């Protein structure tokens, strides 16, 4: 989800001398719309998978890699695409890049919702400005990610924002290890990087890690009833894989 720690996660990984942070590339979503046919009335991906003409998938892979590597240094062995809405297209990603690895950034959904609500996102108006709609989207994102975990061969690592800011070195080592590259201490100096960051968190990643945004939703708890109602209707692990009971995330605790 947007506002779940994707920028911090990318900044840590992109500080590794053998990785390149691509930012939020629109190419996977664009390829998903384009694949299969140019007829707007015909089947769209993934229903159009069986209609793929020979060479179309290879062309799509080449097109994506051209965009992803446009500014990558010659030393880059891993590419990090932090587009959060690519979770919608992981089936296509698995087809294009069967050796890809997925980092699922997790965060208290109440903090995600408050953060989205407070940003001027160029998203669907309801998603950006309606708390119940944001809550519903968070729940459905969780359901789809659980589906991908069971249906796709891609390895998925869950990285919780709260764990990351509580012990950045331990989680950074975990992240780098997941990519298959050796640890490099430069990943802890991510806030000194001069790479361009275009997300709303661009100023936060110029500072050392802090936990000031954890539990920020509590400042607005009196106005979050509709959001909490939506989250309370979800399954017990939908909003926090480590919570023992649903109430931990849907009550005022």
Predicted regions: what is each one?
Residues 26-28, 109-112, 164-165:
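Conserved nucleotide-binding/hydrolysis micro-motifs of P-loop NTPases
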Residues 42-51, 55-77, 116-158, 166-253:
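PAPS-dependent sulfotransferases, especially Golgi type II membrane carbohydrate sulfotransferases
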Residues 4, 85-88, 111, 166, ...:
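Short alpha-helical
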Residues 93-116:
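Conserved phosphate-donor/acceptor-positioning beta-strand/loop module used by diverse small-molecule
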Residues 1-97, 101:
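Phosphate-binding active sites in nucleotide-utilizing proteins
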Residues 11, 23, 78-83, 101-106, ...:
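Short beta-strand segments
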């Amino acid at each position: 989800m947007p506002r779940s720690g994707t920028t911090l996660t990318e900044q840590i990984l992109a500080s590794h001398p053998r990785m390149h942070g691509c930012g939020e590339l629109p190419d996977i979503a664009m390829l998903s719309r384009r694949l299969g046919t140019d007829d707007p009335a015909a089947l769209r991906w993934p229903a159009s998978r069986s209609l793929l003409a020979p060479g179309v998938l290879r062309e799509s892979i080449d097109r994506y890699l051209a965009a992803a590597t446009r500014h990558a240094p010659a030393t880059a062995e891993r590419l990090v695409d932090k587009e959060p809405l690519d979770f919608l297209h992981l089936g296509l990603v698995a087809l294009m890049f069967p050796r890809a690895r997925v980092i699922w950034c997790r965060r208290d959904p109440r903090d995600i919702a408050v953060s989205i609500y407070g940003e001027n996102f160029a998203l669907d108006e309801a998603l950006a400005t309606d708390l119940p709609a944001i809550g519903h989207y968070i729940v459905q994102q969780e359901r789809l990610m659980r589906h991908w975990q069971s249906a796709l061969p891609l390895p998925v690592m869950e990285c919780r924002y709260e764990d990351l800011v509580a012990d950045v070195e331990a989680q950074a080592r975990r992240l780098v290890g997941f990519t298959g590259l050796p640890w490099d201490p430069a990943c802890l100096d991510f806030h000194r990087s001069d790479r361009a960051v275009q997300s709303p968190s661009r100023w936060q990643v110029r500072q050392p890690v802090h936990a000031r945004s954890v539990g920020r939703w509590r400042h607005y708890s009196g106005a979050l009833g509709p959001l909490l109602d939506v989250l309370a209707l979800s399954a017990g692990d939908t909003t926090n894989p480590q919570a023992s009971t649903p109430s931990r995330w849907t009550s005022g605790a």
